[in-house]
Amino acid sequence: MSLAARRKVRIRLYGTNPADVEQVAREIVDLAKKMGVQVKGPIPLPTRRLVVTVRRAPSGQGYHTFDHWELRISKRLIDIEASERVLRRLMTIRVPDTVKIELQLI
């Protein structure tokens, strides 16, 4: 295999369910190791925490009570040395709806 045909791929996984993100990351790493390519990761990135504070009483009258809603976004980063064969196998992995994937050629 020539050097031009071999590239690095950076895979970013993110989602609201940390268990699903971890499972997909584990499947990608297992697949890459099984195919014999070099893998770095999964690297856990900081969890993003989105908080929304809303007033309970819509009219503005009465006690000042508030609800707090929170959404946590877990992220993982995986770098693999991938050929076309490996990328085709990556497309066959089942990904839950709660996990989003970004691929970037480096």
From Swiss-Prot:
<keyword id="KW-0687">Ribonucleoprotein</keyword>
<dbReference type="GO" id="GO:0006412">
    <property type="term" value="P:translation"/>
</dbReference>
<dbReference type="InterPro" id="IPR005729">
    <property type="entry name" value="Ribosomal_uS10_euk/arc"/>
</dbReference>
<keyword id="KW-0689">Ribosomal protein</keyword>
<dbReference type="InterPro" id="IPR027486">
    <property type="entry name" value="Ribosomal_uS10_dom"/>
</dbReference>
<dbReference type="GO" id="GO:0000049">
    <property type="term" value="F:tRNA binding"/>
</dbReference>
<dbReference type="GO" id="GO:0015935">
    <property type="term" value="C:small ribosomal subunit"/>
</dbReference>
<protein>
    <recommendedName>
        <fullName>Small ribosomal subunit protein uS10</fullName>
    </recommendedName>
</protein>
<dbReference type="InterPro" id="IPR001848">
    <property type="entry name" value="Ribosomal_uS10"/>
</dbReference>
<dbReference type="GO" id="GO:0003735">
    <property type="term" value="F:structural constituent of ribosome"/>
</dbReference>
<dbReference type="InterPro" id="IPR018268">
    <property type="entry name" value="Ribosomal_uS10_CS"/>
</dbReference>
<comment type="subunit">
    <text>Part of the 30S ribosomal subunit.</text>
</comment>
<dbReference type="InterPro" id="IPR036838">
    <property type="entry name" value="Ribosomal_uS10_dom_sf"/>
</dbReference>
<comment type="function">
    <text>Involved in the binding of tRNA to the ribosomes.</text>
</comment>
<dbReference type="Pfam" id="PF00338">
    <property type="entry name" value="Ribosomal_S10"/>
</dbReference>
<comment type="similarity">
    <text>Belongs to the universal ribosomal protein uS10 family.</text>
</comment>
